[in-house]
Amino acid sequence: MTRRRLVEMCRMYSPGFMFLSETKKDKMYLQDLQVEVGFDNLQTVEPEGNSGGLALFYSNDFSVTFLLLDDRLIDIETIINGNRVFMTFIYGDPVVPNRDYIWERLMRIGVSRSEAWFIIGDFNEITGNHEKKGGKKRSESSFLPFRAMIQSCGLIDFPFQGNQFSWIGKRSNGKVRCRLDRAMGNEEWHNIFSHTNMEYLKMWGSDHRLLLSSILDRPKIFSRKFMFDKRWIGKPGLKEAVQEVGGWTVLMIIDQS
């Protein structure tokens, strides 16, 4: 995805957070990008050679405490609508044998998480053959570690719109599409932000779809008096106007692979 497209997406959705995985870029490049997309803050994990790298951009609307920061996940504590919450941003290991270690870490984190917890990103894994199209059918046992992590952490998927097959790749027998990207929350999150949802957007110069998640504690209902005009994009006060009407905060998750 080009920098220009990132800027356009941020102007369109005014997200409170933006997570980039597989950035392959150093901090100086990402700091320049931060200025272009208009975020107040940036936390990065440096890539190793020509692979890896994470970046979390966020606005001053959120007081963020970083709890864990490494090449696979960023774990934070923040306040949303007066509620203390936890948020984890994931980039699952593309190497299958290495994924179990990530699931174990998440389960250790989940044991002590009774407060609202939101987790989102590219997990590089699916829960079953129903989340893939094309390629060879996988054995049911291969999905068990990921499912066990989800169950152990008490995570529940959010409703979504759009095409759930968020990644497309090529294999010897043709194209493969999988739902590698998702957002989930524990029971407490669903209790507080009961109308949280996500949307799979278009693929823009990437093999992953953009994933947009809206955090809502009530239905997003726009009155007939509120008419959105694209000419407002980028204008001062747009984000505040939308939040006042819908009461929501948006996270945009973009994979740079």
Feature roles, as predicted:
Residues 1-257:
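A shared catalytic/ligand-binding motif for oxyanion handling
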